[in-house]
Structures are given as structure tokens and as C-alpha cells.
């Protein structure tokens, strides 16, 4: 199975080439030329498998230049007990009769990004070998909070790799910033960027398409790749947990085979919910995909009107990982729903770059609305949902998961749709102690890492080990840069 760019499908790439390159040189995103279907009886077969076995089975359908043995080894290492604090890896928790929560934050950095970023280093280093690449890969990452730490943790001290992470200077939580600032490893770098996440992400994308930078780094023995969800190696491992969740529902007798289930996903860059769409296209019985946004509700408006318009105020919210106005992975959906019309997609992306907006056709809008439902949650609604979940279900959730639960509640009220629904829980509540304590009406709050102990006491839940040990770690990275200087930061890092 070959891969092509969303903006020019005339060139074909192997899976290893697509993963190693990360972003196509025309600025487009790689995706497979076709979507493999789940074989007959596959869901039933997978109910008896471990998470690692499911990952091997599903990923092998997309990665034909990797052996089953290789993928099996990668899955055992990526999702092993030394990395995840539960054998289930991504456990499904029942909230009430029709609602389940897919906990995706049991990995080493306590966010769903671990599900892909523990796997990506194995996929990337194996891809380099398959491509007979002798240069060192430098991974550039723009983060709205969680990706940065998960990528740093995944790639620290991995041979033939260096990783540089950029995050918005005042746009991540204190715990997220501390996680990155204390990162260990000899091959890692971290810098804040003055501006918001979109500034950091646009800066990184600009570096990828900078020919003179590519030549300069090649002479020094480096080439650039990405660990953001623009890399197919990030999207693919995420498909696994949607299929795995359905298999768990089958195993528990909560659904019968073929019964449709809705998924509600907190959404920023559109990568997580895109993986759910791929699972649906593979044949997973999914009814609706609920796209849950915060006050930066550019996607809610897009799904409703077909107009994508980032010309709007940018809000720093209590769910910072979704504070995004340019949702990169939407480009892959547009390519899929247009039947692979690369010129159309390239045109939309040029309009977005030049004017900040584009309008899809009525036909495309209807296709989007046949699967996706958009909704958003205000700051007050997000906080109220955290309190409500604690009061009614004794279940502590983070701010991003709260956005999804609120959107689900609104959707059910408006439509009466009582289809069983799985909410993707994307981060541990302990990553956002400040906002969660506010939601629980705690007025006299601690500061720094003492917030972790305070939330543990108030909630009766222990802080996850990777966060509880932060207070003992040394701060290594404190620098910041203007977005115009990101190129200099990278060249300096690679001296």
C-alpha cells in the first residue's frame, strides 16, 4: 500500500518513506491511497486479544513494508507495563448505562498523546533503516501542551535522533510547562515561543518547507521530520484505540456485533477524531462522531456552515491543548471526502494561508454532516461539567474531557439520540490541577507541584506517578524565542 500527499498525489511513497519524511515537501500531509477494510470476523477475533496484539493486527493492515513480527515487538515495547500503569493500556470505564469513558492517559506523560508517541519512535527508527537513511533525524514539534512532553519522552536518548519542541509561552498549564522544562535526555531541546499555538505550528511548518534550511542541515548530516499529528505515524496508532474500545464493549456484552456506537472526541488539531473516522471507514460500526471544541470553536462553525474561518479572536482557555484555530488534520478529511481531489485541497489550503478562510461545496458540507456533529463548551460549562461528574458519578475528569461530556449532553438534549457513546478522555485531571480545583470550588489553592497533593486530597485519587515525581526534578529549559527566530533556534540546537 502506497502513500500520497493531500496536495499532489502524483508521487507515491512507501509507508516507511511517509513516516520518515513526516510532512510532504509540497506542504501536504501523507495518507494511504486506500483505506483497508477490517476482515470478516476481525472484531470478534480481537475481543480475545491484548491491546498490544490488537495494535499489531490493525497497524499491519496499513504498513505493508513492516513485518508482523516487527510490529508485534514494537507494540510490546511501546505499551508495556514499564510505560503504562494498567495492563488494559486504554481502559474503558462505564459512566452510566449508555455512556463509557475511554481513558487514554495511563502512559508516561498522562495524556492521550502517549498512545501514539510511545509507538512512533519504533516506527520512525525502523523506517530510517528501511530507507537506508544514514543521516540523523531532527524531529521538530509544535505543542499546545501534551504533544511536546509525550514526544520528548518517546524520543529521549533514541539513537540517531534529536528532538526540538516549541510551545506557546503563556499557552500551557503550569504542570505541562514543568513536564517539558525538566525533560531528561541528551538529545532533547525545548523553547517557548512568543505567541499562541498556531504561531508555533505555522513556524514549524515553515521550517519544513524551507529548502535552504534543508540543504544546510543535510550538509551537517541531519534531516527534518515531525512528531506532530501531521505525521501519519501519529494518526495510525490512534486508530487502534477506537477499534479496541469497541472490542471491549463486545467483550463486556455492552453491545452486540454490528451495533453502532457514537464517539465524542475533544478536538483541537483534528488528528484524534480523524483516527476515529478512519476506524469508521475500515468498517467499525460508528454512528456519529461528535467533535467537541472549547471557545476556540472554529470546527463547530465549519461543520455547521462549511466555512472554515480562523479570522476570529483567539482564547486562552482552561483546556489549552484545544486552543487552536488552524486544525491541520482537517486537510486529510477534505482529501478523503473529495475523492482524492489534490488540486481542490491545495486550493483550500492556499486560501487558508492567504485569507484565513475557505468555503467547501454544499455537497462536501453534507458529507461532513452525515458523520460529524459539532459542539462547543464555554469555560463556565466546562467547569460545571467537572463538578457535575464528581457529584453524580464520583468520577474526576480533566478540562478537555469535560468539554466532550458537555457537548455530548447538549447533543442528546437536542436530538434525543440515545445511541451508546464512548467519550475519549484525553488527559489526567492532574495535568490541569488549577482549573479542576476551581471547578471543585476550592478557593484556597496551593501553588506549584503542591497542587498535585491538594487535588489528590480533595478528590481521594492519587496523582499519577510521573506527575507526583515532578517536584524532585531539575529544571533544564527556560529559554524563549520570537517566532521569527525559530530557524536560528533549530540551527543552533544542531551545532
Regions found by a protein language model. Give the residues of each.
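PLP-dependent amino-acid enzyme catalytic core
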Residues: 1-495
Amino acid at each position: 500500500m502506497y502513500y500520497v500527499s493531500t496536495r499532489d498525489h502524483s508521487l507515491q511513497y512507501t509507508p516507511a518513506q511517509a513516516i520518515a519524511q513526516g510532512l510532504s515537501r509540497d506542504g501536504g500531509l501523507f495518507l494511504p491511497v486506500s483505506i483497508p477494510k477490517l476482515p470478516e470476523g476481525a472484531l470478534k477475533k480481537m475481543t480475545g486479544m491484548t491491546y498490544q496484539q490488537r495494535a499489531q493486527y490493525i497497524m499491519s493492515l496499513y504498513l505493508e513494508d513492516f513485518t508482523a513480527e516487527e510490529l508485534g515487538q514494537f507494540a510490546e515495547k511501546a505499551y508495556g507495563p514499564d510505560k503504562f500503569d494498567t495492563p488494559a493500556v486504554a481502559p474503558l470505564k462505564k459512566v452510566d448505562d449508555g455512556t463509557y469513558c475511554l481513558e487514554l492517559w495511563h502512559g508516561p506523560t498522562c495524556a492521550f498523546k502517549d498512545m501514539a508517541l510511545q509507538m512512533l519512535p519504533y516506527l520512525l527508527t525502523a523506517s530510517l533503516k528501511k530507507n537506508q537513511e544514514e543521516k540523523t533525524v531532527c524531529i521538530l514539534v509544535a505543542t499546545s501542551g501534551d504533544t511536546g512532553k509525550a514526544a520528548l519522552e518517546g524520543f529521549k536518548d533514541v539513537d540517531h535522533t534529536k528532538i526540538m519542541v516549541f510551545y506557546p509561552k503563556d499557552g500551557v498549564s503550569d504542570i505541562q510547562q514543568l513536564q517539558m522544562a525538566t525533560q531528561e535526555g541528551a538529545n532533547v531541546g525545548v523553547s517557548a515561543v512568543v505567541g499562541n499555538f498556531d504561531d508555533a505550528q505555522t513556524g514549524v511548518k515553515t521550517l519544513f518547507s524551507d529548502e535552504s534550511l534543508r540543504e544546510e542541515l543535510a550538509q551537517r548530516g541531519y534531516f527534518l521530520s515531525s512528531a506532530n499529528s501531521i505525521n501519519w505515524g501519529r494518526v495510525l496508532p490512534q486508530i487502534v484505540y477506537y477499534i479496541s474500545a469497541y472490542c471491549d464493549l463486545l467483550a463486556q456484552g455492552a453491545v452486540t456485533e454490528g451495533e453502532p456506537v457514537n464517539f465524542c472526541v475533544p478536538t483541537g488539531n483534528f488528528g484524534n477524531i480523524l483516527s476515529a473516522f478512519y476506524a469508521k471507514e475500515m468498517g467499525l460500526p460508528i454512528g456519529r462522531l461528535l467533535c467537541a471544541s472549547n471557545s476556540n470553536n472554529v470546527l463547530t462553525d465549519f461543520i455547521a456552515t462549511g466555512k472554515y474561518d480562523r479570522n476570529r479572536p483567539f482564547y486562552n482557555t482552561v483546556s489549552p491543548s484545544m486552543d487552536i484555530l488552524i486544525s491541520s488534520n482537517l486537510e486529510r478529511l477534505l482529501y478523503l471526502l473529495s475523492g482524492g481531489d489534490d488540486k481542490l485541497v491545495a486550493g483550500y489550503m492556499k486560501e487558508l494561508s492567504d485569507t484565513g478562510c475557505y468555503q467547501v461545496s454544499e455537497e462536501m458540507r453534507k458529507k461532513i454532516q452525515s458523520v460529524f456533529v459539532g459542539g462547543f463548551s464555554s469555560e463556565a460549562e466546562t467547569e460545571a461539567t467537572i463538578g457535575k461528574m464528581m457529584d453524580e458519578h464520583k468520577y474526576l475528569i480533566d478540562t478537555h474531557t469535560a468539554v466532550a461530556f458537555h457537548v455530548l449532553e447538549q447533543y442528546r438534549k437536542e436530538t434525543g439520540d440515545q445511541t451508546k457513546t464512548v467519550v475519549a478522555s484525553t488527559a489526567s485531571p492532574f495535568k490541569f490541577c488549577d482549573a479542576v480545583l476551581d471547578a471543585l470550588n476550592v478557593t484556597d489553592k496551593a501553588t506549584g507541584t503542591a497542587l498535585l497533593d491538594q487535588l489528590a486530597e480533595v478528590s481521594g485519587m492519587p496523582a499519577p506517578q510521573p506527575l507526583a515525581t515532578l517536584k524532585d526534578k531539575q529544571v533544564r529549559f527556560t529559554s524563549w524565542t520570537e517566532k521569527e527566530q525559530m530557524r536560528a533556534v533549530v540551527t543552533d540546537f544542531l551545532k
